[in-house]
Amino acid sequence: FVFPVIKKKAGKDTVCDDFIADWRNFVLQNPYFNLNHWLKEMGAENQQAQIFVKESDEIVRKLSLKSSQGGYKIMIIWLPEKMNVECSNKLLKLLEEPPAMTVFLLVSEEPDAILQTIQSRTQRFNIHGIKEPEISKVLQTKYGLQPEDADDIAHRSEGNFLKALETIHLSEENKLFFELFINLMRLSYQRKIREMRQW
């Protein structure tokens, strides 16, 4: 795996292997995530995540090893648009002429942001969104939503399951805040100043 990371220490080259244990746990806990979730997991406060130039050397090194089962070697690069220019340039030759039985999977949220020289060396497959009935069914069975609510959220998610999950979370937050607001209004109506201050 190759994925965007933040610099751990100034002056030290950071590579994905520095975060690989965190990455594996993160992906196993929730397979639906985006860059913001990963940044939060890494503890990146104001740092930008990138795939740094040192990573290109690591990719070359890893692909020079024999495959453990004697078959294909697969390099998955998540968000290749986050590769810095030096890293991209160092990988051009490898992408153009990969070693035998080697496959690169570049998983991108913004394919047009990938360097044109890399785009020209790849074959693009657009993955379409998940159909509304499928999202609705999962929301009902796995998350216990009522059919009407699940259908509404599935429609608003536009085929993006992560967006559907975030909508569920926002709905739960909105319910909580609404209940808190109701309690505050009741205390206000009853003129219970002491309880309002404690609230």
Q: Residue locations for each model-derived region?
A:
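Charged, glycine-rich active-site and insertion segments that engage polyanionic ligands
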Residues: A100-V103, E109-W199
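Conserved catalytic/switch belt of AAA+ P-loop NTPases
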Residues: S64, N89-A100
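Loop/turn-to-beta-strand initiation segments
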Residues: Q69-I74, P99-L105
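Clamp-loader machinery-focused feature within the broader ASCE/P-loop NTPase space
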Residues: F1-E86
